């Protein structure tokens, strides 16, 4: 990949944390990109670890329209699982691949503004871009920020933010190219076949038909929002697929392109 000024924002799902080989492969790809002058910013979820920790503490996981409901009593556990354990597992994999990384959250460096998204969801946040100084400094050093989706309101209250939405906001903030990586190769049609490209109308139709639902609906809508805001396609792809990672490292299109 040729050196360019655009930041590649990689959003990784929680399932990656349970696949050591997948993490190693992804970090090796990121290391090669960084060595080639590409700035890389990683944003992560950690839903599976959150679910485990909640269950261990006798609490249940509740979701509303694909988004995690976060009661106040669950916030310390969710913050620990995301900003703590998940973040450090990824940082460990990055270190192993020779990447200098900075573990951070949305609360760091005055990076975003946060507010309650919807009272029905509890302490779930909605964030908007605020100040890119901190991120741009880290990236300018050739380091890779690894950002969890825990944000903070002005009164110090922690909020849990959907990681796809967090990645969208950070991509907007740094003017980056967004790739949403999950454990599926992209958006699949009703027959399980990969859809190479989608626009807003096609997405709305597939949501209405129930083909795109729950977590993938949140993911695709976040991708569409950033595609429209930045006037460029956003990719939904898989960290499981080695060929997609190789193509990604070369700057090629992978998975499903969400068109503005």
Curated annotation (Swiss-Prot):
SUPFAM superfamilies: Carbamate kinase-like
Molecular functions per Gene Ontology: acetylglutamate kinase activity; ATP binding
PANTHER family in the record: N-ACETYLGLUTAMATE SYNTHASE (PTHR23342), N-ACETYLGLUTAMATE SYNTHASE, MITOCHONDRIAL (PTHR23342:SF0)
InterPro entries named in the record: AceGlu_kinase-like_sf, AcgluKinase_fam, ArgB, Asp/Glu/Uridylate_kinase
Protein family (similarity comment): Belongs to the acetylglutamate kinase family. ArgB subfamily.
Highest rank taxon of the organism: Bacteria
A Pfam cross-reference name: AA_kinase
Source organism phylogeny: Bacteria, Pseudomonadati, Pseudomonadota, Gammaproteobacteria, Alteromonadales
Functional pathway: Amino-acid biosynthesis; L-arginine biosynthesis; N(2)-acetyl-L-ornithine from L-glutamate: step 2/4
Catalytic EC class: transferase
UniProt site (Transition state stabilizer): 11, 219
Catalytically driven reaction(s): N-acetyl-L-glutamate + ATP = N-acetyl-L-glutamyl 5-phosphate + ADP
Protein's name in the database: Acetylglutamate kinase
Organism: Shewanella sp. (strain ANA-3)
Enzyme Commission (EC) number: 2.7.2.8
Functional summary from the UniProt entry: Catalyzes the ATP-dependent phosphorylation of N-acetyl-L-glutamate.
Keyword ATP-binding tagged: yes
Keyword Cell division: no
GO terms of biological process kind: arginine biosynthetic process via ornithine; L-arginine biosynthetic process
GO CC annotations on file: cytoplasm
Record-listed substrate binding positions: 46-47, 68, 160
HAMAP family cross-referenced by the UniProt entry: ArgB (MF_00082)
Keywords per UniProt: Amino-acid biosynthesis, Arginine biosynthesis, ATP-binding, Cytoplasm, Kinase, Nucleotide-binding, Transferase
Subcellular location: Cytoplasm
């Amino acid at each position: 990949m040729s050196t360019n000024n655009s930041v590649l924002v990689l959003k990784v799902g929680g399932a990656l944390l349970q696949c050591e080989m997948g993490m190693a492969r992804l970090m090796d790809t990121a290391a090669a990109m960084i060595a080639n002058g590409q700035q890389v910013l990683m944003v992560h979820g950690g839903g599976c670890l959150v679910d485990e920790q909640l269950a261990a503490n006798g609490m249940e996981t509740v979701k509303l329209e694909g988004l995690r409901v976060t009661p106040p009593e669950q916030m310390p556990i969710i913050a620990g699982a995301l900003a703590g354990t998940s973040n450090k597992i990824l940082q460990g994999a990055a270190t192993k691949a020779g990447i200098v990384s900075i573990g951070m959250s949305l609360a760091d460096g005055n990076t975003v503004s946060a507010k309650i998204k919807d009272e029905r969801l509890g302490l779930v946040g909605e964030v908007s871009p605020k100040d890119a100084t901190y991120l741009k400094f880290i990236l300018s050093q050739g380091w890779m920020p690894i950002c969890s989706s825990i944000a903070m309101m002005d009164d110090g209250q922690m909020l849990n933010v959907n990681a796809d939405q967090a990645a969208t906001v950070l991509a907007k903030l740094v003017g980056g190219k967004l790739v949403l990586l999950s454990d599926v190769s992209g958006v699949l049609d009703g027959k399980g076949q990969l859809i190479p490209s989608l626009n807003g109308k096609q997405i709305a139709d597939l949501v209405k038909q129930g083909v795109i639902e729950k977590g993938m609906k949140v993911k695709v809508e976040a991708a569409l929002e950033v595609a429209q805001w930045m006037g460029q396609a956003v990719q939904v792809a898989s960290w499981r697929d080695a060929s997609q990672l190789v193509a990604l490292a070369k700057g090629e299109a992978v998975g499903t392109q969400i068109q503005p």
